[in-house]
């Protein structure tokens, strides 16, 4: 294949069935795009002039397919890298029920962005393509830099209503299969959280998760930091019923109605201000209520299975100081959104 021949454009004028049609296409894309880094030659630099003199490539999609797979990485050598997620290794291993997960690795990079637009539901991305050798080299540089911002510019919208997808108003129902999928999908988050907090060498006592789901994430945190006290809220009665065994202080409530006092929390995890969980408007409304709960010099850590809806720049407008923007998992050789902010 020639450089830039790898990414398939979607042409469908109507929505595709998720498993029977979309996933089938995504398997084709994966087979065309994926490479094992051990099979790719090492290079010791990239030639920017060469790349920017290449013929640009155009990739197209619609916002009712998988637009949330398109991501931007910035800054890298003063430029913006565009990429697109391909089928997740967790899906291939049957550990999640979604086609994609939160992790990004080298084969998902496309090249340097030239321009992008969204018009009449159609997304058009024009970029200067990387070779596989360049993808490997660039990714190996990016994965060492915790300040690189991963931004997902496009949201999935329902074909008929044009609205963003959200979870049910009463929250998720609980079932053992969902619990397993949620657990597998956040293994890398748990590992990175433990590593990051241990490196800070600070004793965070009151830990709050306003949408704690099964409570197992907080339970895992407490195992690693046994002196902490965990508070877990969730919209779903079923989830809180399960979480009772895993959280020090569980409560069924909507995060926007959180009863916690301002300046009462040392560390808050936000794992639900994400695409397909809440819509963008509500993500901001909820965040405005929640961030004052954290004490000065406390931390807010934000990530999720799907893209974070609040932009890094907007977090900063609320007076939060960014410490890192992404996490890295060595086992999967993957990066993912992992925002850590200090409260002024």
Model-derived segments and their meaning:
Residues 2-47, 52-61, 65-161:
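N-terminal auxiliary segments of SAM/dcSAM-dependent transferases
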Residues 267-281:
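A short SAM/SAH-binding and catalytic strip from SAM-dependent methyltransferases
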Residues 214-257:
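Class I SAM-dependent methyltransferase SAM/SAH-binding core
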Residues 203-213:
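Conserved class I S-adenosyl-L-methionine
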Residues 148-196:
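Class I SAM-dependent methyltransferase Rossmann-like catalytic core
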Residues 297-304:
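Conserved beta-strand signature within the Rossmann-like core of class I S-adenosyl-L-methionine
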Residues 256-268:
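A short acidic, Gly/Pro-enriched loop at the edge of an enzyme's catalytic core
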Residues 283-296:
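A short glycine-rich, Lys/Arg-flanked "PGG" loop and its adjoining helix->strand segment in the class I
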């Amino acid at each position: 294949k020639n450089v830039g021949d790898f990414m398939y454009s979607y042409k469908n004028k109507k929505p595709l069935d998720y498993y029977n049609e979309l996933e089938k296409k995504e398997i084709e894309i994966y087979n065309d795009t994926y490479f094992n880094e051990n099979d790719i030659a090492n290079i010791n630099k990239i030639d920017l002039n060469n790349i920017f003199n290449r013929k640009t490539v155009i990739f197209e999609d619609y916002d009712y397919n998988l637009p949330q797979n398109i991501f931007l990485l910035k800054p890298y050598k003063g430029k913006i890298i565009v990429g697109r997620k391909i089928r997740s290794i967790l899906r291939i291993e049957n550990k999640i029920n979604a086609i994609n997960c939160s992790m990004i690795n080298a084969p998902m990079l496309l090249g340097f962005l030239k321009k992008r637009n969204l018009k009449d539901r159609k997304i058009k991305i024009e970029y200067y393509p990387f070779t596989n050798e360049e993808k490997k080299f660039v990714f190996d540089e990016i994965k060492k830099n915790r300040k690189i911002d991963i931004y997902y510019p496009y949201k999935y919208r329902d074909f008929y209503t044009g609205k963003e997808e959200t979870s049910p108003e009463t929250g998720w129902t609980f079932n053992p299969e969902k619990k397993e999928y949620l657990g597998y999908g956040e293994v890398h988050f748990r590992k990175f959280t433990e590593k990051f907090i241990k490196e800070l060498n600070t004793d965070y006592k009151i830990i709050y998760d306003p949408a704690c789901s099964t409570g197992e994430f907080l339970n895992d945190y407490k195992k690693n930091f046994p002196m902490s006290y965990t508070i877990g809220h969730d919209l779903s009665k079923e989830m809180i019923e399960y979480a009772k065994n895993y959280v020090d202080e569980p409560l069924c409530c909507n995060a926007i109605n959180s009863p916690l006092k301002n300046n009462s929390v040392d560390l808050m995890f936000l794992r639900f201000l994400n695409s397909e969980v809440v819509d963008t408007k509500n993500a901001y409304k909820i965040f405005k209520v929640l961030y004052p709960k954290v004490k000065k010099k406390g931390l807010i850590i934000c990530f999720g299975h799907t893209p974070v809806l609040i932009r890094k720049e907007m977090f900063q407008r609320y007076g939060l100081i960014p410490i890192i923007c992404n996490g890295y998992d060595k086992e999967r050789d993957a990066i993912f959104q992992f925002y850590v902010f200090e409260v002024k």
